[in-house]
């Protein structure tokens, strides 16, 4: 039986269409885009085409606004550090949400060590950023606002259009990390008011090893990698032509298939969430309910009384690939900073799992997941001292304190019923 892949926000398989597009650039059109001969010209033309395709996906004004990097992490580093270094004379203050991706938060920490300052705007219990809190954080030395389009853990869709208006009204560039949403949600950088926006094509059926950074022509950006004058002098180094061709092909595919992808994942997300909450008691959805404020590919869940890492490992043995936010480090459980930022209790954070859907998932696969996961949870709870204490009334549930003790289907106080 084919394994079920529910970890699409980590990476996606390369689509056959993308794979077909990139193959010639490994063995036939292998030239260096900077070379003057026909091999270089063919590679250079391929880069130009990929810029057009990526620009079309996000409705950029010009293909010249597209820069290629080695990945989403480098794109974020270039956006944050590049704007900061280019704006030193104007100011040194950066605003970020408290739950940005580490590529952004760690870049900001690096800059703080160099004398920049940062305001980390808190979020509500669903991970939503209040635009008024961002407005209130602006000072005369603010040079950059960083808020992601969709959070990488919670799946919450942030109010980017409102933030774009605030940034524009104050003459401050807005950097939007769209790695989580690119290829899955409509993106229009002009309507958003984004000065910079990053994508990672391997998240929407492209290749790993390439990133995209949109930069509005008026956004000042210093280079952070020095060498040649590739990418308009803003990103030195010979371009990864096959991966960039793949980025363009994946962008074109996403633009063409976006309505179908969105509709399908919305349907599967609802079916999956409805089935899991019906069959697994003491299960919490982190982030907004499925709907207009949540990306349809993501379900972030807390399974009470067990550890998410254990469930992820057991699911893998049973042919289901999913992610766990919490991980064991030595004898302690490391809680994801995002879950801490939304105020999730540690007892729930340690039971965190993330299921992320893709266009190749089927209703039959969802049915298998709904048949399998409740049994795995019952098995782990049968081995859990916390579940045993809860069943004996010694501790209470953090999810539903007033519900009283309750066994899941197939569970007893001592574990799963024998088959």
Predicted regions mapped to residue ranges:
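Pyridoxal 5′-phosphate
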Residues: 1-419
């Amino acid at each position: 039986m084919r394994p079920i892949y529910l970890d699409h926000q980590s990476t996606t398989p390369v689509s056959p269409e993308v794979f077909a597009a990139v193959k010639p650039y490994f063995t036939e059109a292998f030239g260096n885009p900077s070379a003057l001969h026909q091999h270089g010209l063919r590679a250079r033309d391929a880069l130009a085409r990929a810029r057009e395709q990526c620009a079309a996906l996000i409705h950029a004004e010009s293909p010249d606004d597209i820069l290629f990097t080695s990945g989403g992490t480098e794109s974020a580093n270039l956006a944050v550090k590049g704007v900061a270094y280019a704006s030193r004379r104007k100011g040194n203050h950066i605003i970020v949400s408290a739950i940005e991706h580490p590529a952004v938060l760690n870049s900001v920490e690096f800059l703080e060590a160099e004398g920049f300052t940062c305001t980390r705007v808190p979020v509500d219990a669903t991970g939503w950023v209040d635009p008024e809190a961002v407005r209130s954080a602006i000072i005369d030395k603010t040079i950059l606002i960083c808020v992601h389009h969709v959070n990488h853990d919670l799946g919450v869709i942030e109010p980017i259009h409102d933030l774009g208006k605030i940034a524009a009204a104050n003459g401050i560039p807005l950097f939007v990390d769209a790695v989580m949403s690119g290829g899955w949600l409509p993106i229009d950088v002009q309507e958003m008011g984004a000065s910079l926006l990053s994508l990672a094509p391997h998240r929407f059926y492209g290749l790993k090893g390439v990133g995209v950074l949109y930069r509005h022509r008026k956004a000042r950006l210093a280079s952070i990698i020095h060498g040649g004058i590739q990418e308009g002098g803003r990103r030195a180094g010979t371009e990864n032509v096959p991966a960039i061709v793949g980025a363009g092909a994946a962008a074109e595919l996403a633009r063409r298939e976006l309505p179908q992808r969105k509709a399908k994942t919305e349907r599967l997300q609802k079916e999956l969430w409805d089935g899991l909450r019906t069959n697994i008691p003491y299960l919490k959805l982190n982030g907004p309910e499925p709907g207009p404020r949540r990306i349809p590919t993501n379900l972030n869940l807390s399974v009470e009384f067990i550890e998410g890492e254990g469930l992820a490992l057991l699911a893998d043995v049973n042919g289901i690939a999913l992610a766990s936010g919490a991980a064991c480090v030595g004898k302690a459980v490391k809680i994801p900073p995002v879950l801490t930022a939304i105020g999730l209790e540690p007892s729930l954070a340690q039971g965190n799992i993330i299921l992320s859907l893709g266009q190749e998932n089927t209703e039959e696969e969802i049915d298998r997941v709904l048949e399998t996961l409740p049994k795995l949870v019952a098995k782990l709870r049968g081995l859990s001292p916390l579940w045993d204490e809860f069943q004996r009334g010694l501790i209470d549930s953090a999810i539903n304190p007033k519900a009283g003790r309750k066994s899941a289907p197939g569970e007893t106080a001592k574990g799963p019923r024998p088959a």
